[in-house]
């Protein structure tokens, strides 16, 4: 799963709306929609209930949110660790 899709997913879950998620991510609203549809297709499940007032996580969405946040935190730690190192590749 593409981490960009996970970032869009977690932002939408937190903000509750496609417009606010798009603004926070500096993306077009249509891009947020495509990211969520792509993620739902890849996972084979609906992640949000779309309501007139915003979005609500489904049970599948709630389960994914926990794992997605962990993955994104791990990626951030790896990136931070890479910047702190001396740039040498060891093996």
Where are these regions (language model features)?
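The N-cap/first-turn positions of alpha helices
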Residues: 2-8, 29, 61, 68
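Conserved amphipathic alpha-helical core elements
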Residues: 9, 39-40
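Short helix-boundary/capping micro-motifs
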Residues: 12-26
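Alpha-helical residues within the helix-turn-helix
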Residues: 23-24, 41, 62
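A short LG(V/I)-centered, amphipathic sequence patch enriched
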Residues: 40-57
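Alpha-helical linker/hinge and terminal dimerization helices associated
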Residues: 42-43, 64-86
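Interdomain hinge and pocket-entrance segments immediately C-terminal to HTH DNA-binding domains
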Residues: 53, 82-91
